[in-house]
Amino acid sequence: MPLSHFSDLLTVSQLNIRVRDILEKNIGQIWLMAEISNFSQPSSGHWYFTLKDERTQVRCTMFRNNNRHIFFKVQNGLQVLVRACVSLYEPRGEYQLIVESMEPAGEGILRQKFEQLKKKLAAEGLFAEKYKKPLPDSVKQLGVITSISGAALFDILKVLQHRDPSLPVVIYPTKVQGEYAPSQIVKALSIANRRAECDLVILARGGGSLEDLSCFNDERVARAIFDSDLPIVSAIGHETDVSIADLVADLRASTPSAAAERVTRDRRDIIQKLGSHQQRMAMAMDYYFSKLRQRFVHLSHCIEQQHPQLELERQKMQLIHFKISMEKIIQAKLKGLIHQEAHLKKNVLRRAPQIQIYQYQKQIQEEFHQLKAAMERKIHHYVQRFAVVSSRLETVSPLATLARGYSVTCFSSGSMLKKIEQVQIGDELNTRLQGGWIKSQVLEIKKN
């Protein structure tokens, strides 16, 4: 049969490529637990080995950029948990695993459980930022959940002693490793929330293996942290260790020491802020008293301008000016009349009409008396008006009040004394009476 009749004829290379694509797409990434054998580590840095169980085996490759993250000794006979992709080595047509990560079998199981729980809780929203509680700006009392014999507590207290030695600390002791640790941590969280005596809680432990830290990857602990009414700061292991508790907590600190630094204030900052507040208060008080002094001067000036004595003086000056004006008018009128009389006498003497002279004299005398009486009435009217105004002003004058036997008492600062509650023993007082001032000191206070 001619080759042209085989439209789908493949080469070996094409076949291997198709098989590789099928393996990678249909199977993809897997988790596998097996024993290492035939382990080799050539100069290229890549690892080549076989994973086997009691009956079968599969070839594996782990490239250098992945195996450089492995920090345990890999050797034949070691049980491991690997994450790998199924593929095909085309030159030989052999299927193989491309290993991406590897852990000893014990830790591998824990890691697998960690990933499963992480995926579950993430789907429920326990890691969501919207549920994170904000930390208080100022911590008045700090709670710490940890082992009382662990290094984590020592590190936290050391930082507090340096930064804020006056901060009260409540320790909720618990196991942080082992079978009973999760239940004790949950109980400690419950006690802290029930007492509600702290502003926030640090959940802390020193570094360790994945198995050592497994209690912080427990679902019960994660849900207790999520349900806490108090903000929780996690400080578990080293910076590279990330636990489920870290993901659920309201804030993750890389170490217990870092957690203590994050939630406390440096006493040097506190002293600096207090100094700044004191300076601002002093400036505010200076400004306030300056305004009070300005207002006092202004009010004193207004009182002086409105004092009844000044009004009396103004009225008096008006009467004096009026009197002078009236005297000038009268003198001018009299001068005119005298001049007129002299002129008339001259005419009379020249003509000698005795009867007419007598009539003119009589008319002049009558007009003089009328003018004089009018002037006296006018002066009397203004004198009476002045007396009325003076009487009214005297009625409202503080001096008149003093004349009736009353007095006015004020502090040495000038402020008026109105109530007995203003006075304290030892205060110096100034009392205004009719005719002068009395300066006194308070020796005894009696209330009605």
From Swiss-Prot:
GO terms, biological process: DNA catabolic process
Tell whether Nuclease is among the UniProt keywords: yes
EC category: hydrolase
According to the UniProt record, one GO cellular component term is: cytoplasm
User: What name does the UniProt record give this protein?
Assistant: Exodeoxyribonuclease 7 large subunit
Role, per record: Bidirectionally degrades single-stranded DNA into large acid-insoluble oligonucleotides, which are then degraded further into small acid-soluble oligonucleotides.
The annotated subunit structure for this chain is: Heterooligomer composed of large and small subunits.
Q: Which PANTHER family does this one have?
A: EXODEOXYRIBONUCLEASE 7 LARGE SUBUNIT (PTHR30008:SF0)
Gene Ontology molecular functions: exodeoxyribonuclease VII activity; nucleic acid binding
Keywords linked to the UniProt accession: Cytoplasm, Exonuclease, Hydrolase, Nuclease
Primary location: cytoplasm
Catalyzes what?
Answer: Exonucleolytic cleavage in either 5'- to 3'- or 3'- to 5'-direction to yield nucleoside 5'-phosphates
The family this protein is said to belong to: Belongs to the XseA family.
Where found? Answer: Cytoplasm
Which gene is transcribed and translated to give this protein? Answer: xseA
EC numbers: 3.1.11.6
